[in-house]
């Protein structure tokens, strides 16, 4: 039996995180549809409205890394799974802390209070976990193209940039998760942001490759 045909050993846990992940998206979409069709409905929720926005956002951002960790656990094994989690989160955290403090490598920006609390008062705790989760997925996608290692890593970093192309308008404009301090060319985003995403992502996936990559390894 091949690794892809085996039942997932943590199927129940995987389904729980998948349910939370999908449910948070469905709840958010339903809420946005309601407010678009009946904007006056927002007034009925009063002070609870921000929580109806924050809770599904937190559920989404916490369930995504949990889902990725459990999904890939049989492939990576416990030790490599933890190392990938720590490395991706650490690099993402450091890049964000440096970025919010200096304006490099992403450009001048700051996180709002929407995802409080924050690490050192600058970066929401869930953000580094998102770097880990999405970078594992993009490296896996790039690896499936069966290209040389250097091409695979560059593709993974480019996939991360494409993720940000879709993410930034939603999180920087649609939801007030962060604010740009400049008037950039793309939803206020400066061009340096994509360069910063590429470099940060490349550092993350290079570390993943050093730690064994994302390929399945048969264990005894």
Residue ranges: model-predicted function:
Residues 2-220:
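Aromatic-rich, lipid-facing transmembrane alpha helices and their immediate juxtamembrane interface loops
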